[in-house]
Amino acid sequence: MNPSSIQKIGTWSTRMVESTLARYPLKEAQWHYEHGLQVMAIEKAGEITGEPRYINFVTDWVDYFVKPDGTIRTYTVEEYNLDQINAGRLLFSAFRRSGDERYRKAIELLMTQLADHPRTNSNGYWHKKIYPYQMWLDGIYMGSPFRAEYAQTFNQPEIFDDIIHNVVLIEKQTRDPETGLLYHAWDESKQQRWCNPETGCSLYFWSRAVGWFIMAVVDILDYLPENHEKRQILVEILNRTVEAVVKVQDEASGLWYQILDLPDRKGNYLEASGSTMFVYGIAKGVRLGYLPAHYVLSARRGYHGILENLIKVDRDGLLTLDNVCGGAGLGGDPYRDGSFEYYISEKIIPNDPKGVGPFILAALEMEQAGVDEVL
């Protein structure tokens, strides 16, 4: 689509999809969690709108990586990195649309990693092989919805119990009893310099980490059978987490801070990816009956705040999403110490996929809820 035509499109979700397609050539694609998230959002927009160009783009993206023998370009099992699983969620719909066995083989290749992926002594997945005995909130989103869709698609219900175990374990270990918020990560060995030596938890409530977790739970529930005996456990976890998140929503803007509970600390800022993830997770949770209806007010405030404060429209109608934290992790080389100063020092990148993908998903949810925002 010609960029000058984008401003004539009626919804924010499709305007962002068109803006993304205009600036995201296939040669820049990466088999990585953030690109997978962005492409999944484009696919969801295609399913809802019926726009074939969106689905065609997704097909081309998947085919750019999946070889005829089912191996995945740039992916290696032995890296044992949960971040590399998330893009695999696109393989299920590719398989359903085509019946092509190479997509099934690619799915099984990713499951090979998950079958042997290192675990903590309490049987939770390490975030990555290079981060021993560590569980990160991010990792629940990276691996668990994929496994849940696999369990549903290929009728392997025993996987659901292990998925729920991982969610319950990390919530138990990272939840702060005073605020109800979740710390970014947990080191079972309590050896990392970034962790509290008594609890093993990192020291701050990073908005996007909690956003990953909320998105993971609402997406896992898409596949978990309605009659599963532990389904209510996930619903209760979702409610606890959302209740805590809504309490720290900024009153003036409707957005959320990079470090959730320290709005007045110098350097903290209203961050886009966490805010878009919260709007998506809350709105979807309300729509599907997991959350009380009154939470839609929080989602609406957040959505309005995103459009009012973080979305820019250029002369061609292309959208830009500002204030996206480009990346934040713990440990590694150079070592990331998990301090407040570390989290606020990470580079801010406009239109980073980790913000654009959740923005599209959030906008689709709000549009389904009948919210018609005009900037």
Residue ranges and their predicted role:
Residues 140-141, 204-217, 276-278, 359:
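Alpha-helical bundle segments that constitute or directly flank the non-heme di-iron/ferroxidase center
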Residues 20-23, 40-45, 79-94, 126-142, ...:
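Carbohydrate-binding/catalytic loop surfaces
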Residues 49, 98, 150-161, 220-232, ...:
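Inter-helical turn/loop segments and adjacent helix faces that build the functional surface
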Residues 3-36, 48-55, 64-82, 86-88, ...:
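CBM-like carbohydrate-recognition segments
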Residues 7-28, 56-73, 105-124, 157-186, ...:
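Long, well-ordered core segments of solenoidal/helical folds
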Residues 214-263, 267:
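Oxyanion-binding "anion nests"
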Residues 138-153:
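Acidic/serine-rich, low-complexity amphipathic helices located in mid- to C-terminal regulatory regions
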